[in-house]
Amino acid sequence: MSATGDRHPTQGDQEAPVSQEGAQAEAAGAGNQEGGDSGPDSSDVVPAAEVVGVAGPVEGLGEEEGEQAAGLAAVPRGGSAEEDSDIGPATEEEEEEEGNEAANFDLAVVARRYPASGIHFVLLDMVHSLLHRLSHNDHILIENRQLSRLMVGPHAAARNLWGNLPPLLLPQRLGAGAAARAGEGLGLIQEAASVPEPAVPADLAEMAREPAEEAAEEKLSEEATEEPDAEEPATEEPTAQEATAPEEVTKSQPEKWDEEAQDAAGEEEKEQEKEKDAENKVKNSKGT
């Protein structure tokens, strides 16, 4: 080896491949940028030259520099690691939305085919609730035959209930209102006091006696009225003039009728004679 200052062989060997491989990587990257954009997945594809160019210096560099170079090699140029991580969840969300839409469509189809399915369940719930209430309802009134027979009877039983009540007199009722108004209801109280109190029987026996007593009183009054009527024709005799007056009236009426009939007949005869005279005059005038 010459003394002109050749470097250490190991250092020369390390730098030489780095420079050569870096130039190759830059040339390959420029070519990929020009021709690789036309394809759909050009940003996702990592050039082989870049991987090779980075793999060479990893052996000679330190641990930190090697890790950085490996990270750059793993990430594609057209995107980032976050974009790659978002691709997976986006596709999953789209699939879930499609599945939900399909399920909703199936439900809508079922609802159109069977519109009364909900009403069926509502009716069943209503019937169930009604049966539950009827089974647990303890205050239902049931007719008792004995009580109904006792209630259906003569009207006297109902009257007995009302007969025991004390009578409400008009003065008491009006007096309560007059006490509230001092000086206004005195006239009403006096008028109510003048009204006789109604007689209210206390027992059924008295109520039964009243119609019998009324009937007996009516009979007595009728007998008393019949006796003076029978005595009047014996005491009072019609006078002779009163007895003859209607006979004269009856006799004079036919005579008047005969006179009227005779007058009417005489008038008819006169009219007939006048008509004959008129006809004779007409005949005589024609003959002349």
Curated annotation (Swiss-Prot):
Question: For bias kind Basic and acidic residues, which ranges apply?
Answer: 1-10, 207-222, 271-282
Question: Which tissues does it occur in?
Answer: Strongly expressed in testis, low expression in placenta, and very low expression in brain.
Coiled-coil positions: 259-287
The record's section on InterPro entries has: CT47
Composition-biased stretches (Acidic residues) = 81-100, 223-235, 257-270
Ranges annotated as biased composition (Low complexity): 20-31, 45-60, 236-247
- A Pfam family recorded for this sequence: CT47
Q: Which keywords are on file for this protein?
A: Coiled coil
**Which residues lie within the region annotated Disordered?**
1-102, 207-288
UniProt name for this protein = Cancer/testis antigen 47A
Organism equals Homo sapiens
